[in-house]
């Protein structure tokens, strides 16, 4: 089984506020393609979670069931699998509407794969699935954190 993360998760070298400000400016670049917007949205969501006391354990982890955008440990010790959806407009519905029932099933399967990998075995106080939406409008991205989304 091929499990991979496309990003290492280094410790931040800047205060979270500076990271969020920098990412917010980059998200408002009108020349970005949708894939780039999505990647920056994931970075923005992870930085925001870290600013709330969360610890990023993994990002963009792949297995046969798909990709886990962000895997974090929240301050209560739960392992939280965070699906991030970033949009410029609501033309095609809200970002959270893109997390369909079939997507949720695949995310659950991917989470089991992540949890059972020997390198990820760790004590925890439970597992949860959250959705973070990032809407790039106005002067600052609008982030919405849906805890226990499914």
Swiss-Prot record:
One Pfam family cited in the UniProt record for this chain: UPF0102
SUPFAM superfamilies: Restriction endonuclease-like
UniProt cross-references to Gene3D superfamilies, sorted A to Z: 3.40.1350.10
S-S bonds: none
CDD domains: PoNe_Nuclease
GO MF annotation list: nucleic acid binding
The family this protein is said to belong to: Belongs to the UPF0102 family.
NCBIfam families in the cross-refs: PRK12497.1-3, PRK12497.3-3, PRK14681.1, YraN family protein
PANTHER family the UniProt entry points to: UPF0102 PROTEIN YRAN
Name this polypeptide is given: UPF0102 protein BAD_0596
Species this chain originates from: Bifidobacterium adolescentis (strain ATCC 15703 / DSM 20083 / NCTC 11814 / E194a)
């Amino acid at each position: 089984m091929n499990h991979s993360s496309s990003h290492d998760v280094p410790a931040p070298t800047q205060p979270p506020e500076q990271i969020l400000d920098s990412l917010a400016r980059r998200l408002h670049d009108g020349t970005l393609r949708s894939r780039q917007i999505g990647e920056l949205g994931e970075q923005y969501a992870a930085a925001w979670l870290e600013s709330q006391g969360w610890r990023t354990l993994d990002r963009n982890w792949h297995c046969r069931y798909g990709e886990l955008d962000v895997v974090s440990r929240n301050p209560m010790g739960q392992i939280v699998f965070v699906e991030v959806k970033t949009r410029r407009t609501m033309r095609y519905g809200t970002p959270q509407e893109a997390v369909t029932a079939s997507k949720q099933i695949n995310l659950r399967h991917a989470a089991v794969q992540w949890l059972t990998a020997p390198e990820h075995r760790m004590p925890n106080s439970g597992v949860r699935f959250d959705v973070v939406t990032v809407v790039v409008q106005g002067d600052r991205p609008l982030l919405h954190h849906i805890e226990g989304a499914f």
